[in-house]
Amino acid sequence: MSTVPLTLDEIFDLARKTLLANGCDDETASILSDLIRNAERDGSLSHGLFRLPAYVSGLKSGKINGKGKPEIKKISSSVIKVQGNNCLAPVVLNKGLPELAKAAKENGVAVLAINNSHHMAAMWPDTEKLAEEGLVAFACTSYKPAVAPAGAIKPLFGTNPISFAWPRPGKTPVVYDMATASMAMGEVQVAKREGHKVPLGTGLTKDGKETTDPGAIADGGVLLPFGGYKGSAIAMMVELMACLLYTSDAADEYDR
């Protein structure tokens, strides 16, 4: 496999031109391209250019609205909901985060929920932005089933990632972003593409057997939670907070 080195600016330009050519307006293309560039900068290959073909596929199929405009609805002074109108989640968050920060500063605490959007992408850029404004930030999201609970062999939870950021005046914030699965599915897919094995305990084959083959996990297999039953419990917490608290479907209802 051959590779072509690109600067961060070249990555941004490539992503933006590709998205514009496939149905995105300028605002959407710029938001997504900035996220892709930052993911590549921070070494998160599964959220960088690797994601571009999936975005293009979603745009071409009509599943993703590349020109949609999210709509804000304030449920209370400290609870904000954004209707995504089938935009990609980073576009929806870009609309809601300023309102969230304002509400948190005015009330001491605030919550932002988004729905009818696609692919949350990396969450740390957004929690980091909030921490840079002096706010403590926590984010989580659910998705379609890909992770078997501890002791099971069939998927029930999404990879259900969480991100946390803590402000440090005059210094960079403390930030983390992690899947509650043993590994993000995107990282498994990257390992498959590059021909790498994954650690034992990452996932199971479609027959429920342990494997180090990322292809056997990504193609019909299942991921495992990190930390056994502890990771399962945190994945369940995310499911309840990110979905059912805001009347969205749970992961096991994704295809219903």
Indicate residue ranges for each PLM-predicted region.
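Generic N-terminal amphipathic, Lys/Arg-enriched alpha-helix
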Residues: 2-4, 8-22
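Short, well-structured alpha-helical segments
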Residues: 26-37
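A generic, well-ordered mixed alpha/beta core segment in the N-terminal half of proteins
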Residues: 81-169
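Single conserved hydrophobic/aromatic residue that forms the stacking wall/gate
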Residues: 246-256
